[in-house]
Design a protein with these regions (language model features):
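Conserved, well-ordered active-site substructure
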Residues: 203
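Expand to "…catalyze enediolate/carbanion chemistry for C-C bond making/breaking, isomerization
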Residues: 197, 206, 210-217
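Conserved alpha/beta-domain cores
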Residues: 1-191, 197-199, 211
Length: 218
């Protein structure tokens, strides 16, 4: 089977599974980390317009080859933000006011921003605590340049994703009472995107279900 046929078959399967559970529009972000730009070109050929990267260097390189909506979803380092904001149009992982202050200074174009919320308080994995979330939201929503889209989260290691997304839905509903315009939810990966959608996810970040397994060292 050719690489085009393999990706096409996987992509159609994912799209069908999204359609089976979605009662609202869902943006499929194809996560291309560790995969070559040639795979991104195939995805574009198949109608994919949104691509996700966790690493600045990979995103910078591939975005030069394939135009589209590029999403950065990795943990943010301040010294990488000038580069990240040069190629990404969406950031899914803002969890620190200091990072937003840097974004305000270095971003060459308006960004769509999701705030990453931690569901278990393990901040080394990324994510602001619920108590910090509103302060961060006030900061971003007050920007005249950038757009606060909503929330992003990843289920804690070892937990039931369905329970995690149920918890996230409660946090989101409370958040939207304060910030009704920030109604987007970035949640769900290859193993659990249907559950995330059933709990309200508007953006799912799917890699291996479309492009195949990554090698263990990656």
């Amino acid at each position: 089977m050719s690489r085009l046929n393999e990706i096409s078959e996987n992509l159609e399967n994912v799209r069908s599974k999204i359609a089976a559970v979605a009662l609202h529009p869902v943006t499929l972000i194809a996560v291309t980390k560790t995969f070559p730009a040639s795979d991104v070109q195939i995805l574009q050929q198949l109608g994919v317009t949104d691509f996700g990267e966790n690493r600045d260097a990979e995103g910078a390189e591939k975005s030069q080859v394939v135009s589209g909506n590029w999403h950065f979803q990795g943990q943010i380092q301040s010294n990488k933000l000038k580069s990240i904001t040069s190629w990404a149009s969406v950031i899914h992982s803002l969890d620190d006011p200091r990072h937003f202050e840097v974004i305000e200074k270095v971003a060459p174009h308006p960004l769509t921003i999701f705030l990453q919320v931690s569901l278990d308080g393990a901040h080394h994995r990324g994510g602001a605590g619920v108590d910090q979330l509103y302060q961060l939201a006030e900061l971003v929503s007050g920007s005249s340049k950038h757009h606060l889209a909503g929330l992003m989260s990843v289920p804690p290691v070892g937990t039931d994703p369905d329970q995690a997304y149920s918890q996230l839905a409660v946090i989101r509903n409370e958040f939207m009472a304060r910030f009704p315009q920030a109604d987007q939810l970035s949640a769900g990966m290859s193993g659990d995107y249907q559950s995330a959608i059933s709990h309200g996810a508007t953006h799912v970040r799917v890699g291996s279900s479309i492009l195949g397994s990554r090698s263990p060292h990656q």
